[in-house]
Amino acid sequence: MYRTKVGLKDRQQLYKLIISQLLYDGYISIANGLINEIKPQSVCAPSEQLLHLIKLGMENDDTAVQYAIGRSDTVAPGTGIDLEFDADVQTMSPEASEYETCYVTSHKGPCRVATYSRDGQLIATGSADASIKILDTERMLAKSAMPIEVMMNETAQQNMENHPVIRTLYDHVDEVTCLAFHPTEQILASGSRDYTLKLFDYSKPSAKRAFKYIQEAEMLRSISFHPSGDFILVGTQHPTLRLYDINTFQCFVSCNPQDQHTDAICSVNYNPSANMYVTGSKDGCIKLWDGVSNRCITTFEKAHDGAEVCSAIFSKNSKYILSSGKDSVAKLWEISTGRTLVRYTGAGLSGRQVHRTQAVFNHTEDYILLPDERTISLCCWDSRTAERRNLLSLGHNNIVRCIVHSPTNPGFMTCSDDFRARFWYRRSTTD
């Protein structure tokens, strides 16, 4: 049978695939030995691509492997991370250091929470002053691009029509601790230290107060809407997770007390298809739950070596969980095996982390972003290889308590104890 000539580049590609497979399977020391021997030109990410290619070759003839290597559908299109196939995907999206501040809004107290709407058009921020602001991303970009002389000559009416803050909501009597946009309706949910969950209808310009609320027994720490919008997960200072029907306010909890955390819940998030949700807690555990039965499927004990879990979110394809902890480390977990595939280290080198913050994906899941508490800068890693990228100085005058990235565009919001929220964006050359 005719065989194509194998060149040096082919062998280098083979060695990279072997290293990636060893890393994926957990043979770190063997992989490092091979890396030291081969010295590949680029960083190898954990990947199962070699196994898939071998299976294709065994199922078909020996030309199938060569065919699969060049096949477009074996490479992720850049819309999300998938380590089974995309070890060699070239990242096209901008890294964090290329973003710039486009707009700054101020509260009258520390700003510690923000959230994006599903379409990326709106951002809500919450503060210790008990207020909530809703901002329009397009207006923020337009405002930042507007010449000073044009801005100075705006009438009061024009300024109001073009102002990025489209709503300011007041109905809590203590710090706003968590926010979530309804997936389909113009409704914003908020949780607070005043023990209430409130629902605001922001479709009405005159609306300042909530139209519904739920009285909780503890301070709320994290909320997440079911993708249908009919239910909302609530994590509080109490270790028992709640699920509410937002129409009837009926509360559901797992029928097995052993499913619950043993300390306050810091993070709750649904996956896109709603068949799972994930929680992180001060008890150091990450729990994966069945979205239908409300039962705990699995628990990752001491997920961050016993440190408090600050955040846990799903990747777009629901194959992975990205978590962060007070050990200043971000981790990528494979759900099917419960293993840590990638660790993102280097934040928090100047001192122990005191406050909670979040690790987030950028909109293409090419990068992981995590604020460094002491230096007030943003750490950035390649999501597949954990290669450190350039730091971004965040320009705040106090600790950054929250970061949220747009689900659709190269933009993110940072919230700080300096009372400010900064909107960052990477403009293209055509903007």
Curated annotation (Swiss-Prot):
Subcellular location: Nucleus
One Pfam match: CSTF1_dimer
GO cellular component annotations of the record: mRNA cleavage stimulating factor complex; nucleoplasm
Keywords: mRNA processing, Nucleus, Repeat, WD repeat
Tree of life domain: Eukaryota
Main location: nucleus
Matching InterPro entries: CstF1-like, CSTF1_dimer, CSTF1_dimer_sf, WD40/YVTN_repeat-like_dom_sf, WD40_repeat_CS, WD40_repeat_dom_sf, WD40_rpt
Residues in WD repeats: 106-145, 171-210, 215-254, 260-301, 303-343, 395-431
KW Repeat (keyword) present: yes
GO biological process, one term: mRNA 3'-end processing
CDD domains: WD40 (cd00200)
Self-association and partners: Homodimer. The CSTF complex is composed of CSTF1 (50 kDa subunit), CSTF2 (64 kDa subunit) and CSTF3 (77 kDa subunit). Interacts (via repeats WD) directly with CSTF3. Interacts (via repeat WD6) with BARD1. Interacts with ERCC6.
Role, per record: One of the multiple factors required for polyadenylation and 3'-end cleavage of mammalian pre-mRNAs. May be responsible for the interaction of CSTF with other factors to form a stable complex on the pre-mRNA.
Domain comment (free text): N-terminus mediates homodimerization.
Entry protein name: Cleavage stimulation factor subunit 1
Source species of the chain: Rattus norvegicus (Rat)
